């Protein structure tokens, strides 16, 4: 019986190791990447553990990449400081397949890619591109705080839609937004000849008071 239990434990442990293997499929741990930034400082993907990270393969010479960059910038600006169920904050680890440093830096500046940018300037001969099975760009991988791949190749609005699914909703912020809308509606009605001091105003006033009380309780 004891040997049987030990075998079960070993099987479970082996299954855990298998499920957490390093690879490029959803559910795998993304392989580490260590490449220099434009200043020559080496940056490791694993140093960003704890955050939600988009591993983004692109190049300044890639037309589709440049067209996609505004969507990526918008997602970064919107979600950079958010808290997620799968990590704290959102950042981007941009890997360029450029071979000319000047063009790479120019692309970063023009497209306002204000996040981690790295490259070995090896074009399609980059070992990192090979490691991640990248055959075309743009190409990306979304990883959680533990480096596990949760999504791949998120283009256009799909990137924001995917990030939104993982956002931790702040109840206080939600109530405050609702309160702001109700107060605006109340002020508009209060100055309206059509409504004056109607039942609608009293109803709104009660709703405002209830929300203010809810916010106060949440902040305790």
Where are these regions (language model features)?
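Bacterial Sec-dependent N-terminal signal peptides
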Residues: 1-24
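Conserved helix-turn-beta segment immediately C-terminal to the redox Cys motif
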Residues: 67-94
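Alpha/beta-hydrolase fold active-site loops
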Residues: 52-53, 90, 138
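N-terminal "domain-start" segment that seeds a small globular fold
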Residues: 18-46, 168-169
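Short, internal strand/loop/helix patches
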Residues: 36, 93, 105-141, 145
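Short active-site neighborhood of thiol/selenol oxidoreductases, capturing the structured segment around
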Residues: 44-66, 72
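Thiol-/selenol-based redox modules, centered on thioredoxin-like
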Residues: 137, 142-220
